[in-house]
Every structure is written in structure tokens, then in C-alpha cells.
Curated annotation (Swiss-Prot):
Keywords: Cytoplasm, Methyltransferase, S-adenosyl-L-methionine, Transferase, tRNA processing. GO terms for cellular component: cytoplasm. Belongs to the aTrm56 family. It is found in: Cytoplasm. It catalyses: cytidine(56) in tRNA + S-adenosyl-L-methionine = 2'-O-methylcytidine(56) in tRNA + S-adenosyl-L-homocysteine + H(+). GO terms for molecular function: tRNA (cytidine(56)-2'-O)-methyltransferase activity. It comes from Methanococcus maripaludis (strain DSM 14266 / JCM 13030 / NBRC 101832 / S2 / LL). NCBIfam families: PRK03958.1. The lineage of its organism: Archaea, Methanobacteriati, Methanobacteriota, Methanomada group, Methanococci. It is an enzyme of class 2 (transferase). This is tRNA (cytidine(56)-2'-O)-methyltransferase.
Length: 179
């Protein structure tokens, strides 16, 4: 089962930092790919640098039509739209996990940077809210991925990592591979 993130909208300079955080959060918490609807060289290069240093595989893709991508994905996958207006995460997460476990389908999470078109709500198998107060899509994504994976991805390490952090109570423990 693979997890992909589809980010709708990206407003250049305004969203550069938050879009990078969306991608890094996706990677750190278990997603295998992020799909943007607009090209941003800065975000792509930032993500590639992190993957190079911290290891693992994480794909960055840009598509012209999010609708086409999501519709094709839905043929063999489950689509969850993270929105403030969806069903309560506490009430529906078990159902989503069971649905994926039974069907062995991949998961596509849709998150918006701006107003999400009505079609995204209609296309999703689940419209899920992470709280009903305004907050960041990064927070919603992190909470969803952590709950979905039951915390199993929080301390992921990769064999090809050049940088590794060891949790410590009292000091900074970082291993950096020398070239």
C-alpha cells in the first residue's frame, strides 16, 4: 500500500515555504510521492536535497490536470480529501484503515492551498476533517498520517541516509556521513 499526496494549488512566492513543508511532512510521515499542480523549481530542489541527505525514496511530480490524476488513481485506490468541513477524524479513521486493509488499495490524500473545487469533495471516497477550526494543511496532513500509520513512521530511518539523528534526553546526537 502506497500513500500519495495531491496538493491542489500553489501560489508561487506566497506558498513556497508552506509547500516545501507539505512535501517534507509527507515524506517524513510515510508518503511515497507528492503531486503538485504547478511547477516550482525551488520546492522541488529543496525536497530533492532533503531526500539526498536523509535517505529513502520520495517522488515529486507535477501534473497538468489534478482531476484526471485523481480519477485515474481512484480506479485502483482510495481518495481522502482533508478538509475542515469533512467527517470527524476520530469517528472515521478506523473505517478508512479497514477499507484500505481489506482492499489493499493505495491511498491518495488531497489537500488544498486555496479554495478547493467542489469536484474534489465529490470525487473523494472520504472527506475528512482534522478539527473544525482554521489551521494549516501541514497540521492536518501530519495528524492524518500519524493516526493512519499509528505512529509507525515517526522514527523512520533509511540505509542510504547521510544524516541520522538518534533521540536523546539531554544532547543533540547527529551522525553525518563524511564524503
Amino acid at each position: 500500500m502506497a500513500i500519495e499526496i495531491l496538493r491542489l494549488g500553489h501560489r508561487g512566492e506566497r506558498d513556497k515555504r508552506i509547500s516545501t513543508h507539505v512535501a517534507l511532512t509527507s515524506r517524513a510521515l510515510g508518503a511515497e510521492k507528492i503531486i503538485f499542480t504547478e511547477e516550482d523549481k525551488h520546492v522541488k530542489e529543496s525536497v530533492e536535497r532533503i531526500v539526498e541527505a536523509w535517505g529513502g525514496e520520495f517522488k515529486f511530480e507535477v501534473v497538468k490536470s489534478w482531476r484526471s490524476y485523481a480519477k485515474r488513481f481512484k480506479d485502483n485506490g482510495i481518495v481522502v480529501h482533508l478538509t475542515m468541513y469533512g467527517e470527524n477524524i476520530n469517528k472515521i479513521m478506523t473505517e478508512i484503515r479497514e477499507d484500505i486493509s481489506k482492499t489493499n488499495k493505495n491511498l491518495l490524500l488531497i489537500i488544498g492551498a486555496e479554495k478547493v473545487p467542489r469536484e474534489a469533495y465529490d470525487l473523494a471516497d472520504y472527506n475528512l476533517s482534522v478539527g473544525n477550526q482554521p489551521h494549516s494543511e501541514v497540521a492536518a496532513l501530519a495528524i492524518f498520517l500519524d493516526r493512519f500509520t499509528e505512529g509507525k513512521t515517526l522514527y523512520s530511518e533509511y540505509d542510504d541516509a547521510k544524516i541520522k539523528v538518534t533521540p536523546s534526553k539531554s544532547e543533540k546526537c547527529v551522525f553525518v556521513e563524511k564524503d
